[in-house]
UniProtKB/Swiss-Prot annotation:
Entry superkingdom: Eukaryota
Induction: Subject to nitrate and nitrite induction, and nitrogen metabolite repression. CrnA expression is mediated by the products of nirA, areA, and niaD.
Subcellular location: Membrane
Listed InterPro entries: MFS, MFS_dom, MFS_trans_sf, NO3_transporter, NO3_transporter_NarK/NarU-like
Organism field: Emericella nidulans (strain FGSC A4 / ATCC 38163 / CBS 112.46 / NRRL 194 / M139)
Transmembrane segments: 35-55, 72-92, 101-121, 131-151, 162-182, 199-219, 307-327, 358-378, 390-410, 418-438
Main location as per UniProt: membrane
One GO cellular component, as annotated: membrane
Record protein name field: Nitrate transporter
Gene field: crnA
Family, per entry: Belongs to the major facilitator superfamily. Nitrate/nitrite porter (TC 2.A.1.8) family.
Single GO MF annotation: nitrite transmembrane transporter activity
Membrane-topology annotation of the record: Multi-pass membrane protein
Extracellular side: 56-71, 122-130, 183-198, 328-357, 411-417
GO biological process, one term: nitrate transmembrane transport
């Protein structure tokens, strides 16, 4: 099918798990397209609000509240700390209640402190407010778990990375949106600066609530309906299959069931691909195969012991710790990049350096999906998660090399600085996408816990690296090469860890 048509056509669906095999990016009228849209759009608005303070904090809010540089740094760290805690909690909540309801809950709860920004009158009040607004950063977890539930493993890396990349771009968009709203309120409404910045935060509040209501009334929990009934479909479909009314996996004949997702296509069984012949299966054998395939990917509500084993398994740590380096570096560098540019190129001015710094976040639109796309491409060619693992290791090592080069050279040339930053952005953000392409393979029955753990480690890395920058005394180049050394060492040290535990079901 033509690529342009894939973006708008109803997706083909795997009959074993009802997950889409393509991403209808431009088709919000389709169930899968609508879920994908709200996944990235809701996360983008959350990210926009989460990062809405730095663009106005540099001058306006700082002067109005008489904040010191230390208090500004503390507010940045506190915002990351809140998100770390929320992401760790969100994982089990997604497995228990489903990602859609968790997503909606986080948006609505996080919108309240966003609307209360106008009540802040002191630095301490702003720090406390940013802690609660940090709740919105936790929406990353349900965003990824929701996408994983609707898109097949052959395409889930692209879906997850594209949703996250578009969402992360909110961190760059806010550098343009919030100053534009602020300037408009002063110019067109005649508000003084100390009132205009407070009123400006009503806009993200309205957008966040609208997105949450859209999810609530127009989207489904899973491809088969309610989250609480996700296992019922598996049992009913298996019973139906045992009677012969199933999708014929070898011939592509469609089920006689009157309802179901559109465009369901058949999956070729491995023997067909290897031998070039089709081997009909007995209905009972097909039923068992479908049951095993669905059960292996169905998210359960793990017991406390099972959750503990998942969290501290080597396979989980092998994706969580690298994400602490890649996404943690992104968060930390985002917070200092404008100041770093201003330090090395003072003649550019605050506005111009801020716009160039925003481009680091904007590149997520292309770079993060690129990592997921490459990982999916290699997986389809090799049919082994090791392909994704090797790609991840390569991206992580090169990412570290770029940070080391940038830190030791401390460029004074605009071309060199922006070139190294763009190269770093590609490998760093592609690395983020590749990691969440691999996450669905690790303990798929506890995908929420794994996603929450990995997402939480990303914020933990951001906090640690932000502290490194804070105590580097504005020697940003030194802080960047330290991040590069740490990242390279981590990616090399976990490169040997199996991407999927031996005890896990077939891959």
């Amino acid at each position: 099918m033509d690529f342009a048509k894939l973006l708008v056509a109803s997706p083909e669906v795997n009959p074993n798990n009802r997950k889409a095999l393509t991403i209808p990016v431009l088709n919000p009228f389709n169930t899968y397209g609508r879920v994908f849209f709200f996944s990235w759009f809701g996360f983008m608005l959350a990210f926009l609000s989460w990062y809405a303070f730095p663009p106005l904090l540099t001058v306006t809010i700082r002067d109005d509240l008489d904040m010191s540089q230390t208090q500004i740094a503390n507010s940045n760290i506190i915002a990351l700390l809140a998100t770390l805690l929320v992401r760790l909690i969100c994982g089990p909540l997604c497995d228990r209640f489903g990602p859609r309801l968790v997503f909606i809950g986080l948006l609505l709860v996080g919108s309240i402190p966003t609307a209360m920004a106008g009540l802040v009158t002191s630095p301490q009040g702003l720090i406390a407010l940013r802690f609660f607004i940090g709740i919105l950063g936790g929406t990353f977890v349900p965003c990824q778990v929701w996408c994983t539930g609707f898109f097949d493993k052959s395409i889930v890396g692209t879906a997850n990375s594209l949703a996250a990349g578009l969402g992360n771009a909110g961190g760059g968009i806010t550098y343009f949106v919030m100053p534009a709203i602020f300037d408009s309120l002063i110019r067109d409404q005649g508000l003084p600066a100390h009132k205009a910045w407070r009123v400006a935060y009503i806009v993200p509040f309205i957008l966040i609530v609208a997105a949450a209501l859209g999810m609530l009334f127009t989207c489904d929990d899973t491809p088969t309906g309610k989250w609480s009934e996700r296992h019922i479909w598996m049992k009913e479909d298996t019973q139906t299959a045992s009677k012969g009314n199933i999708v014929d996996l070898s011939s592509g004949a469609q089920s006689s069931r009157p309802s179901g997702p559109p465009s369901i296509i058949a999956y070729a069984i491995p023997d067909v691909e290897k031998k070039g012949t089709e081997t009909p299966l007995e209905p009972q054998s097909q039923a068992i195969g479908q049951f095993d395939a669905f059960r292996a990917n169905a998210v359960a509500s793990p017991s406390r012991k099972e959750a503990f084993n998942v969290i501290f398994s080597l396979a989980t740590m092998a994706v969580a710790v690298p994400y602490a380096c890649s996404f943690g570096s992104e968060l930390a560098i985002n917070s200092i990049l404008g100041d770093y540019y201003d330090k090395n190129f003072p003649y550019m001015g605050q506005t111009q350096t801020g716009k160039w710094a925003a481009m680091f976040g904007f590149l997520n639109i292309v770079c993060r999906p690129a990592g997921g796309f490459l990982a999916d491409f290699l997986y389809r060619k090799t049919n082994t998660p090791w392909a994704k693992k090797l790609l991840l290791s390569f991206l992580g090592v090169v990412m570290g090399a770029f940070m080391i080069a940038m830190g030791f050279s401390d460029p004074k040339s605009e071309a060199t600085m922006f070139g190294l930053t763009a190269g770093l952005a590609f490998f760093l953000e592609s690395c983020n996408g590749a990691i969440f392409s691999l996450v669905p393979h690790v303990h798929p029955y506890a995908n929420g816990i794994v996603s929450g753990m990995v997402g939480g480690f990303g914020n933990l890395g951001g906090i640690i690296f932000a502290i490194i920058f804070r105590y580097s005394h504005h020697d940003y180049a030194r802080g960047i090469w330290i991040l590069g050394v740490i990242s390279m060492a981590v990616f090399i040290s976990v490169s040997w860890v199996r991407p999927v535990p031996k005890s896990q079901m077939r891959e």
